[in-house]
Amino acid sequence: MKIFQKGFNYSQDGDGNRLVYHMQGCNLKCPWCANPEGMQCKGTIVSDPEWILESICPHGAISGTKVDRTICVGCKNHECITEHDTKGMYLSYQNYTVDEIVEEVLNNEMMFYDGGGVTFTGGEVTMQFEELLESLKKLKEHRITTAIETNETHI
C-alpha cells in the first residue's frame, strides 16, 4: 500500500482515538484538497530546502535550494531519489505490505480508546482497492474497528 501520511487523530476521522492512514492517489483534482501531495498515484517528489543538495540531480534541476519542476517532469529515472538516500528529495509515499499495516495496528491497539480504531483516507482509498479490502478483512479478524473516507466516485 502506498501511504503518504499516518498518525493518530482523536475523533476527526471516526469515533475515538484513531490511527489514520492517508493513501496515495486520487481520481479527482479538487482545488481545495487538504492533501494535494496525495493526489498523484505515482507519488510526488518532495523537496526540503534545508537538506537539498545540487549534486543529487544529474539533469541540473536543483539550483541552490530551488527545484525546477519543469526539468523533473521529463525525468524518467528520478536519480535524485532512486540513487541517493537523502532528506533533501524523497517520494511522497512509503510502501507498506498489508501485513506490515496489520502488525503496526496491533502494536498500537492499546491506543484505540473511546471506540477508536483505524481509518483509511486519502487521496482516494479505492484507488488501492485490493490492498484496502485485504487490510480491512484482516483488521476485522482482529476485531479492530475500521472506517474509510472516500469520495465515492472511483468504484
Labelled PLM ranges:
Residues M1-K2, Y96:
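Primarily extracellular surface-attachment and macromolecule-engagement regions
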Residues I3-I52, S63-K76:
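N-terminal pre-triad scaffold of radical SAM enzymes
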Residues Q40-I155:
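Conserved Radical SAM active-site core
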